[in-house]
Each structure stands twice: as structure tokens, then as C-alpha cells.
Amino acid sequence: MLVLSRKVNESIQIGPDIEIKVIAIEGEQVKLGIEAPQHVDIHRKEIYLSILEENNRAVSFNTDLLLNLSSQKK
């Protein structure tokens, strides 16, 4: 893991298209601004993990449904 220190209004550049800027530091909370192309999905990690979990449940449900339907046709 790369660890960098930044002050307010300083940025980190990721490739040519993504910039992460420190907007404010208030107590233990850091506010970040992220500029990235529209096709890049950006989520807080807990939201991203929730999306992955929901997608896995949906795939599992669809697989079970397909197996159930295919066994009924036989």
C-alpha cells in the first residue's frame, strides 16, 4: 500500500484521468473531492461491498431459479 501525506487543497493524481483532492480536514474527518471520467464508478468502500453482496445474492437467486425451472421441464 502506498501511503501519502497531503494538506488541504493538495491532490493525488492516479493515471491521466483521476485526481483526488483534499478539500477539508475537520477533526478526524477528511473531505475528498474526486475528479474522474463518468464511466469510472466511485463508491465508499462499505457501499461497494454492499453492492457486491447484493449482486452475488441476485446471481445465486437467478441460478437457483433457472435450475428449478429446468428440472420442471424434464
UniProtKB/Swiss-Prot annotation:
Its main location: cytoplasm. Keywords: Bacterial flagellum biogenesis, Cytoplasm, Repressor, RNA-binding, Translation regulation. One of its GO terms (molecular function) is mRNA 5'-UTR binding. It is found in: Cytoplasm. InterPro entries: CsrA, CsrA_sf. It comes from the Bacteria. Homodimer; the beta-strands of each monomer intercalate to form a hydrophobic core, while the alpha-helices form wings that extend away from the core. Belongs to the CsrA/RsmA family. This is Translational regulator CsrA. It comes from Bacillus velezensis (strain DSM 23117 / BGSC 10A6 / LMG 26770 / FZB42).
